[in-house]
A protein has these predicted regions:
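Conserved hydrophobic/aromatic pocket- or pore-lining residues that grip, position, or stack substrates
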Residues: 2
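Alpha-amylase-like alpha-glycosidases and glucanotransferases acting on alpha-linked glucans and related
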Residues: 6-168
Length: 168
């Protein structure tokens, strides 16, 4: 099954657990998810999803994530977590901006989240989507979690990504 890292602003998750997200007093996001400007998009990608309040989640042992992964493991044999890099570091854009140009990188929960998952659920079968902009902290998190990543053979022949995707 596919597990997107983020949920929609109008999702049941945000409605029922607002304390788990970066929301203001009117329950609107303070910042939203996206990607910075790059060679593919001069203004970046503005996804618009509310961001998690990682401090609040850490304080309750990442219970929201544990419940989410537990439920999906009951449905699927293997989970592919989309945008895995967001657990190491994520791009936060001020809510209301029209582009991603004013965003900033923030530190994600890192291994602490996955340690909580492993403590509660053992070792669920997870594949980490690790395509795109990867940094050393993302590679270190992948290694610490011991989750397999993804390789797209077509990317091996695209000079923008170098040789990371070559099969040998």
């Amino acid at each position: 099954g596919d597990l997107p890292i983020y949920v929609a602003e109008d999702s049941v998750d945000v409605w029922s657990c607002p304390q788990e997200f970066q929301l203001d007093e009117n329950l609107l996001p303070t910042e939203v998810a996206g990607c910075p400007p790059d060679g593919f998009s001069a203004t970046g990608q503005l996804w618009g999803n509310p961001l998690f309040d990682w401090d609040a989640m850490a304080a309750n042992g990442y219970a929201w994530w544990v419940r989410r992964i537990r439920h999906l493991c009951g449905i699927y044999d293997v989970l592919r977590i989309d945008h895995f890099r967001g657990f190491a570091g994520y791009y936060a854009i001020p809510y209301g901006d029209k582009t991603a140009e004013n965003g900033r990188w923030r530190t994600g929960p890192g291994y602490a989240l996955f340690a909580a998952v492993k403590k509660e659920l053992g070792s669920p079968r997870i594949i980490a989507e690790d395509l795109g902009f990867l940094t050393d902290d993302v590679r270190a998190l992948l290694k610490e979690c011991a989750y397999p990543g993804m390789k797209v053979l077509e990317f091996a022949f695209d000079s923008r990504d170098g040789g990371d995707y070559r099969p040998h």
